[in-house]
A protein has these predicted regions:
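The feature marks proteins involved in alpha-glucan
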Residues: 2-46, 80-175, 181
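Extracytoplasmic/secreted proteins and extracellular or luminal domains
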Residues: 53-54, 156
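Short, surface-exposed loop motifs enriched in S/T, G, D/E and P with embedded aromatic residues
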Residues: 72-81
Length: 183
C-alpha cells in the first residue's frame, strides 16, 4: 500500500525501542542500564526476567542458567536490529538465580560470558551473574548524600574503579583459562 507507514509495535517500558537504539548507537543513552542486563518484570500475567545484551558480532545468543540447567538451546534471544542487541523474556526466573550469556560466534564457537550490565555476581572463582531486584533496595545513605553536596570534590581523595578484564577475556589456548593482565 502506497503512503502507509507501519508503526513500531508498542514496546513495554523495559524493552529496547527505536529511541533506545538510536541513543545507544550515538553513545548518548545515559539510562541504558535500565534496558540492558537482567530485569525482574511482569509480562502480562507472567513474572520473570527480561534479558538484554549488546553482542553486535555474535551469530546467536542465548541465556543459560540455573533456571534451565545451563541448556544452551532452551532460551535463545532475539536480535534487535540495527545494533545487535539481543533480548528475551524468560518466565519463572527468580531473584538470586545465576545466569550467563552463551554467545555463538560466526565460526560456531560457543563462549559463555557474564552480563556486563549485571548488578550482582557470584564470588570468584565463579563468573556467573545473578538476577537481583534493584527496585526494592533500601538505601541507608541519606545523611552521607546530604553531606556530600557541601564537599569541594577537587580537594578530596578520589577512588578509581578497576573493571577486571579477567571476567571478559581469557588467554586463548590455555587450559587453566588464565586471566589477562594490564601488561
Amino acid at each position: 500500500m502506497r503512503g502507509v507507514i507501519m508503526a513500531e509495535k508498542k514496546k513495554k517500558p523495559y524493552e529496547i525501542g527505536e529511541l533506545d537504539q538510536y541513543l545507544f548507537g550515538q553513545g548518548n543513552h545515559y539510562e541504558i542500564y535500565e534496558k540492558l542486563g537482567a530485569h525482574l518484570v511482569q509480562n502480562g500475567k507472567q513474572k520473570g526476567v527480561y534479558f538484554a545484551v549488546w553482542a553486535p558480532h555474535a551469530q546467536a545468543v542465548s541465556v543459560v542458567g540455573e533456571f534451565n540447567e545451563w541448556d544452551t538451546e532452551a532460551n535463545p534471544m532475539k536480535r534487535e536490529e540495527p545494533l545487535g542487541i539481543y533480548t528475551c523474556f524468560i518466565p519463572g526466573v527468580k531473584k538470586d538465580q545465576m545466569y550467563k550469556y552463551c554467545i555463538e560466534t560466526y565460526s560456531g564457537e560457543q563462549i559463555f560470558k557474564a552480563d556486563p550490565y549485571a548488578n550482582y555476581a557470584e564470588l570468584r572463582p565463579g563468573t556467573a551473574s545473578r538476577v537481583t531486584d534493584i527496585e526494592n533496595i533500601k538505601w541507608t545513605d541519606t545523611e552521607w548524600m546530604t553531606r556530600r553536596k557541601t564537599w569541594n570534590h577537587k580537594h578530596e581523595p578520589m577512588s578509581v574503579y578497576e573493571a577486571h578484564i579477567g571476567s571478559w577475556m581469557r588467554h586463548p589456548g590455555r587450559e587453566d583459562e588464565g586471566f589477562y593482565t594490564y601488561r
